[in-house]
Design a protein with these regions (language model features):
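Terminal alpha-helical segments
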Residues: 1-103
């Protein structure tokens, strides 16, 4: 498998993971578990953004790096409307509270 083929496989996998996480978020919301729905929605966005950036040749290994790239490469350049950056930031905040609440 060539590096380009491997990258295409990871992009496809990340895109599919995004769909899976989004479906999980919808189920949790319908089940009345909004905190878990927000956590799953965050991961849907995370995987979709990872696929987008990987397609552009950028590999990001940290949540904070992905968040920075979202704002620098998509929001500030006008490729994505500013409210979507706020949505992602809010989901990231909810995820952090959910994951680290017991600590």
């Amino acid at each position: 498998m060539s590096p380009d083929e491997a990258r295409a496989d990871v992009i496809a996998w990340s895109s599919e993971r995004s769909r899976v996480w989004l479906a999980a978020a919808e189920r949790e919301l319908e089940a009345g578990v909004p905190q878990l729905a927000a956590d799953h929605a965050y991961y849907a966005c995370f995987h979709l953004l990872s696929a987008i950036f990987l397609k552009e040749g950028l590999t990001l290994n940290r949540h904070s790096a992905l968040r920075s790239a979202l704002h620098e490469r998509l929001i500030q350049t006008g490729r994505l409307e500013r409210p979507w950056g706020s949505v992602f930031d809010r989901l990231a905040e909810l995820r952090t509270k959910s994951v680290y609440a017991a600590l």
